[in-house]
Amino acid sequence: MIKESTINLLNANKNLLAFSAGVDSSALFFILLENNINFDIAIVNYGLREQAKEEISYAKELADIYDKKIFIANAPQFDSNFEANARYFRYNFFKEIIEQNAYTALLTAHQLNDKLEWLLMGLSKGSGLSELSGMEEIVVKDNYKIIRPLLKQTKDDLLLFLNRKKYKYFIDESNNETKYRRNKFRPISNSLLEFGKRGFNKSFEILEQESKYFKESFKTVFEKDELRVLKLKSREFLPYAVSYTLKELGYLLSGKEREILKNQDSIVIGRKWAVELSGDLLFIAKYIKVVIPKMQKEKYRVAKIPPKIRGYCFSKNIEVKL
């Protein structure tokens, strides 16, 4: 179910599996076991569903049976923007574990349905190539990789695998709640995949190949939490660089926002993200308004940190080293 090259890659890394006890991550758990790939697991309890207690218990049971380390986080209550805040909490939790335990790869169980949902959301917002090409199988971070081994498999493929082998898994009913925007696209993507996955996989391969050209137009020179500093080859690549970076941070750029970026070097996107160009350096960070002491302001000015970026640096005590 996963490629030989992917198996070799996973065997060359110290792996942490993002686990939820749902269909996708349960399938990946047992696929890794069947291929004798070493890994440990991490799970987040958001405390929103009674079933979550059973899922945590099952994760502990699996860790005990198969001699895996398990890391558990209890998320705080999020009063608004649950999906974005939950994602930020989850990936920060994974990152901390990775840094503290010297893991070199984070494994996530995203599959083809997820990838198609992302594409449909992008189309509905007038998105460009970076969003439409979707999730990548391998994303290289500062000191680890994110690897998604199941991107060419459908949800039905994974269900068939689990049911045939009689492996236990849970169904998260919140995935059907339409108050979450992404869930509205799920029935559409599921019905489209009934026509077969080969054509969709081929189209995604082509999109990814074409997007590689644009990825070579910039490089990340500094990264900390939700701050990125990119070095651009040319101003014309700014909209793509912003789009690609914000996609990694969980925000899909709209067509209107892309148009604005063609002509503006300093902007706040969606009232959340500050984007500022200084020479050939592009700064992207969460937009935070705070009172900054005069002496610290001067330090930022001397360090050439753009004004809209300073609030995030100050609130997170980040010293940008370029």
Name what the model sees in each region.
Residues 1-120, 156-157, 164:
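ATP-dependent adenylation/nucleotidyltransferase module used to activate substrates
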Residues 80-84, 181-183, 265-266:
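Short, solvent-exposed polar/charged micro-motifs at secondary-structure junctions
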Residues 113-250:
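Flexible helical/loop "lid" subdomain adjacent to adenine-nucleotide binding pockets
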Residues 83, 195-198, 293-298:
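Short, charged, solvent-exposed linker or helix-capping segments at domain edges/interfaces
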Residues 6-13, 139-140, 205-322:
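AMP-forming adenylation/ATP pyrophosphatase catalytic core
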Residues 65-69, 94-98, 130-134, 194-196, ...:
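Glycine-rich loops and low-complexity Gly/Arg-rich segments
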Residues 44, 75, 151, 173-175, ...:
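Proline- and acidic/polar-enriched loop/turn elements at helix boundaries
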